[in-house]
């Protein structure tokens, strides 16, 4: 590769908390070590930071897009005519060297209307999962803000403040705060569906998807026992997104073309999907959601524990990867229906791999390298706020023992969370969630967390010790054979 390249990059992930900034830092460090100049735009939970200007993009030799929730059409249009290397953000951290070595051969030339591949790269830039994660990322602030308000109202009631609703006269302050909080959960579903659709087809899909998903989730309007919930958001968001994506390709002539996006697409899409949702999609999705809720509420304990083990194991298995995200999405989506115990598994298990790895370096330092020991304190602090990604470097160094230890401990801890009846109202601050009212009971949370960490650390020490001894023995035998 030629020396002193000018590179620009964008990083984003569904939560916008850990991967976004860790990958940005890794890209910057690697570029500097190779003598390149780089600027990375981060699209995290705090919004867009270090935004790339059109001049910087124009001057760049290559563009790196490490994304977990996709990019809007407007964002992608910024790179028309540029050589672009795309990679899933969950893969970027472990393949930093590969990214830079493959820039000349595996980049894509973005045309104004479509991407034309130059190299061998096979990247699904618009995968269904990336669209779903765009919806989840947009819904997070609604749930976080709403969940904290609901928790605050509950805490105020526990401190003795009155709780009266409108049916008993003037509502109390605690009722008002709680009601505002529940609005976050109410709008979580239409926002999720709207951003799924707009991730596929940009702004013209946003309004129809928002309104139709709101309709699908309103059981009073539909006359059903349950709203469509996250199932409706996923199905309708994807359907409307792809419908509008196709609709935008219609050519009406110069005089009428400007009306397509502003008038025809919203009108036709809302009419078609609004009617379909009222008579068909809404009732069907509502029945499915009602069946799922009934199953979760009446599931036998043995089966519930088995499911909890599976969810916990999935959350700990690939630390922010697709398996983790699938389990996380399932648990998160149930919050809107006020089912909080499954999301409590996320609140405990997600922080265990990095914290356990960090603590294990202090307990058994001989099992870890100097770099791993130096990163231990950071892994503990960052991991304690439910950012699982700091565990990735430890897993890359010793995949079999670390992933096995995390998965076993995660599964067992998932069972304990359900057994102790722990609930989590919304995403928060990890280990501090009980202190701000987001997780309860407080004592059960810290007890289960302590047990889970003890198991995780024990598994790491035993399994990695065996793995290192076996590795050393194999190396010694190979040395003997050579002589």
UniProtKB/Swiss-Prot annotation:
Pfam families: PTS_EIIC, PTS_IIB
Record's subcellular location: Cell inner membrane
Catalysed reactions listed for this entry: D-fructose(out) + N(pros)-phospho-L-histidyl-[protein] = D-fructose 1-phosphate(in) + L-histidyl-[protein]
Protein's membrane topology: Multi-pass membrane protein
Domain PTS EIIB type-2 residues, every copy: 1-105
InterPro entries reported for this sequence: Bacterial_PTS_Sugar_Transport (IPR050864), PTS_EIIB-like_sf (IPR036095), PTS_EIIB_2 (IPR013011), PTS_EIIB_2/3 (IPR003501), PTS_EIIC (IPR003352), PTS_EIIC_2 (IPR013014), PTS_IIB_fruc (IPR003353), PTS_IIC_fruc (IPR006327)
Record-annotated PTS EIIC type-2 domain positions: 128-475
UniProt keyword annotation of Kinase present: yes
EC number: 2.7.1.202
Single GO cellular component term: transmembrane transporter complex
Catalytic site: 13
Transmembrane segments: 132-152, 180-200, 204-224, 227-247, 264-284, 303-323, 344-364, 380-400, 402-422, 442-462
Keyword tags: Cell inner membrane, Cell membrane, Kinase, Membrane, Phosphoprotein, Phosphotransferase system, Sugar transport, Transferase, Transmembrane, Transmembrane helix, Transport
Residues recorded with modification Phosphocysteine: 13
Gene3D superfamilies registered for this protein in UniProt: 3.40.50.2300
One GO biological process term: phosphoenolpyruvate-dependent sugar phosphotransferase system
An example molecular function term from Gene Ontology annotations: protein-N(PI)-phosphohistidine-fructose phosphotransferase system transporter activity
Chain's role: The phosphoenolpyruvate-dependent sugar phosphotransferase system (sugar PTS), a major carbohydrate active transport system, catalyzes the phosphorylation of incoming sugar substrates concomitantly with their translocation across the cell membrane. The enzyme II FrvAB PTS system is involved in fructose transport.
Entry's free-text remark on domains: The PTS EIIB type-2 domain is phosphorylated by phospho-EIIA on a cysteinyl residue. Then, it transfers the phosphoryl group to the sugar substrate concomitantly with the sugar uptake processed by the PTS EIIC type-2 domain. The EIIC type-2 domain forms the PTS system translocation channel and contains the specific substrate-binding site.
Designated name of the protein: Fructose-like PTS system EIIBC component
